[in-house]
Swiss-Prot record:
Source organism of the structure: Ligilactobacillus salivarius (strain UCC118) (Lactobacillus salivarius)
Pfam families: RNase_HII
Record's keyword annotation contains Manganese: yes
Disulphide bridges, residue numbers: none
Required cofactor names: Mn(2+); Mg(2+)
Name recorded for this polypeptide: Ribonuclease HII
Compartments where found: Cytoplasm
Binding-site residues, a divalent metal cation: D76, E77, D168
Length: 255
């Protein structure tokens, strides 16, 4: 290999290289090169670990596929805790060859990574759907029941009827056999994919609401009770998307 500059080597190491190329680079004693190699190997190790963890998250699906259960829907929700906006759910059926190893619990991912994976899930999944319960329904039936209704809506909106449902920590009112899995978004790839779809969908909705109702910081807090949000409630009052059964919204309405 012709003598390269450190900058050229760093650029080269942004992509995967052959073991022969790596061995040759290791002969270069320049400190900058050795640091670049160390960083490269650390990144490869991280990817290797992520792939292994992903295979573990696919174990439940793989076991069911081996039993002839073809269509398995992972179901998850986001938005049970905020003071404003809907609770959003998603249902995702993954193909047997799904290999997007970075798909994980949405809470473990950056906004940029979630957006990137959201597009890949929509592109590669067998079926994807979302369900939604708005703040009025939440106030009418309570957040738990509203979440269950949104999950049922997501399942019924799939263009393929699943043979099995894996749901994160809840049960859905359906005759389809279901597996209730505590922390399912960290244990099942299908549920993890659903958590990403639900989160990105709700984030987009809250960004839309932020333009309609400025001054509450919905684009940053997603409707949660941050300082800016609480100050907005005090100064501007309650919006049509606030959950009136939630404190301190309820208290403000009584003033």
């Amino acid at each position: 290999m012709e003598k390269l500059t450190i900058a050229q080597i760093k650029k080269m190491l942004t992509e995967e290289i052959s073991s022969e190329q790596l061995a040759e680079l290791k002969l270069d004693e320049r400190k900058g090169v050795q640091l670049a190699i160390k960083s490269y190997e650390k990144r490869l190790k991280k990817i290797e670990n992520e792939k292994l963890e992903f295979q573990n998250r696919l174990k439940i699906e793989r076991d069911l596929w081996d039993k002839g259960i073809e269509y398995i829907a992972g179901v998850d929700e986001v938005g049970r805790g905020p003071l404003a906006g809907p609770v959003v759910t998603a249902a995702v059926i993954l193909p047997h060859d799904f290999d997007v190893f970075e798909v994980n619990d949405s809470k473990q991912l950056s906004e940029k990574k979630r957006e990137e994976l959201y597009k890949k899930i929509l592109e590669k999944a067998v079926a994807v759907s979302v369900g939604l319960s708005d703040n009025n329904l939440i106030d009418e039936v309570n957040i738990y029941e509203a979440t269950r209704l949104a999950m049922k809506q997501a399942i019924e909106s799939l263009n393929i009827t699943p043979q099995k449902i894996i749901v994160d920590a809840m049960t859905i009112d359906t005759k389809i056999p279901q597996l209730r899995l505590i922390k399912g978004d960290a244990k099942s790839a299908s549920v993890a994919a659903a958590s990403i779809v639900a989160k990105v969908t709700r984030d987009h909705l809250m960004q839309f609401y932020a333009r309609i109702y400025p001054g509450y910081g919905f684009e940053k807090n997603d409707g949660y009770g941050t300082k800016q949000h609480l100050e907005g409630l005090e100064n501007k009052g309650v919006t049509p998307i606030h959950r009136q059964s939630f404190e301190p919204v309820k208290k403000i309405l009584l003033k």
